[in-house]
Amino acid sequence: MTSDTPQKSPAREPKPGVRSQISAPEKGSRDLIRWLWRDYLRHHLGFVILALILMSLEGAMLGALSYLIKPMFDKVLVAGQSDAVLWVALAVFGVFSLRALASFGQRVIMARVGQLVSAALQGDLVRHMLTLDGRFFQDNPPGTLIERTRGDSGAAANVWATVLSVAARDVISLLSLLAVAISVDWRWTLIAVAGAPLLALPITVLQNLVRRTSRSAREASARVSTRLDEIFHGATTIKLAGTERREAGRFQDEMSGMVHAQIKSVAGQAGIPALMDIVAGLGFFGVLLYGGQQIIDGTKTVGEFMSFFTAMALVFEPLRRLGNVSGAWQAARASLERLHAIFDERPSITTPKKPAALPVTADRADIRFENVAFAYADAPVLRGTTFTAEAGKTTALVGASGAGKSTLFHLMTRLADPVNGQITIGGVPTTKMDLVQLRGLYSVVSQDALLFDESLRDNVVMGAEADEAKLKKALDAAHVSEFALKLDHGLDTPVGPRGSGLSGGQRQRVAIARAVLRDRPVLLLDEATSALDAQSEKIVQEALEKLSEGRTSLVIAHRLSTIRNADKIVVMDKGRVVDEGTHDELLARGGLYADLYRLQYSEGKTVSDGSAGRAVSGPRQGDTGEDGKGSGLLAATSRMFGNVMGLFGRAKD
């Protein structure tokens, strides 16, 4: 027997290419069962065998019970043999006791293995999805991925218990009960089961219906989860727009679609045992006509008839379960096909077999963009972008929203790859570098500070090795210490889902402290001070400028006051570099930068470049001091996928 630790499945060979949406091509039942057994169930072989033995014992007891009906009627109730009362009673008690113990044992074992398999399957699924490209998370919203991870994995892991129950308990029950029935009268048995062949065609039709409707029901459930995710995360926007009734109506429409799909699926599953009951009724009708006359004629005893009647009545119970498991398997098969489709996804961005050595010091980490082009869904974002961010200096990127600034960051870190051109760091193309080592070159601070539902300390450290002295230095540099000391538990205070227990400015400071602590040779700042007030911005800006010293730094800024001291400013417009130089040089030449600068500071007002007319979002939960609360594992999964998607959400900027 194996340990209780969920087993990680062996490496699989998925099909190349990333699909734009998760598709679920039909797989053969044998292939799916083989996959489930090979990667998960076989790790619990000892417990599976024990469960099979207990199920077989439980099933055999039904045959024993029906067999005891004959002496109970003939010897005790009809003949009145007092000496037979005790042993018949003891035998019946023994049968019920053994059946109860076997049932208890196999149910506990099946539940245990089911939970372990479900945990292992979900763990493997999450690990695999985190290896996929950003496009996968853009094309598949969190609600869909949560439904796959929780709903489909649970259905796939639990179906094994139903299948094994039929394979062991119900098959043994069926055989033992049929043996008793045949021993009483084989002709009665033939009459009782004569209608069984009539079930073949309708059951096949219903099985296909169940598989289709189960797939539709799961897809509808995924749409409901996605809608809920959008509603809860966009509650402030909905309230400010006054669209509560509209969003509630859209959610109700999705719910209606899901309910309709689930009703069709349940109706298909319920139809199989219903048909079996009708055929069973016809069989009993024939046996009563034929066997009843034999009892009247005295050729059969009441005990024989009751034993046969009990056996055949019990036979149809495992047969009904067989019908149910057929429907349950078709539903689970749809889930397994969807899971298999995700496992078949393969990242297009991978580490080369022989990665090049990395430039690990700041004086070698110059970054060169050479004729870089990129597009989203055939919509060009970058068009032949070429410039150099010199080693050890600060390069700022400015331009209207949609100019492609944030896309450059995504390409640098290989969250996506350019469709043309190349990016080099220290003269080495990023596509030839080890992915983990490449991303390890960067400290990143974006305008969307992504925090996890952990302590403040954990959100700053984020897996980095740091002693208390280094941690304190980072906290002081980002001015996190100022508010951390006021929290109930200091650095050990949970920040809430997505950092909802902190204000927007506080979340931004935590992200900056995280970057300070990482202490990497390349610093990427994507509107890093956008969430701060003027006083905090000045303090943090000074800390960032100090952090930038001696590093290759790239800064995306809307407020041009924050990049006046940059060594070089690259001006972008519609995916192209239209100008570059220092602040003074660009102002002297005129052009787009000078226009943006005058726009921001005309009449003493600050207007973000390209931000005029941008919709104003409502206050974040953290700004009001409200604490968001998760809801167990489902909330944790939702937060994880939300945070992963947040990494890619601004890529088109």
Language-model segments: residues:
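Membrane-integrated ABC transporters
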Residues: M1-L62, L77-A91, Q106-M110, R127, ...
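Juxtamembrane loop-to-helix connectors within ABC transporter transmembrane domains
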Residues: Y40, H44, Q106, M110-G114, ...
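Transmembrane helix-loop-helix hairpins at lipid-water interfaces of multipass membrane proteins
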Residues: R42-A102, I182-R187, F285, L289, ...
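A hydrophobic transmembrane-helix motif
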Residues: A64-S66, K70, L164-Q207, I263-S307
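Loop segments that connect adjacent transmembrane helices in multi-pass transporters
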Residues: G123, Q138-G143, S216-K264, K354
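Cytosolic ends of transmembrane helices, especially the final helix of ABC transmembrane type-1 domains
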Residues: A220, T243, A267, L314-D344
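ABC-type nucleotide-binding domain
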Residues: P359-D653
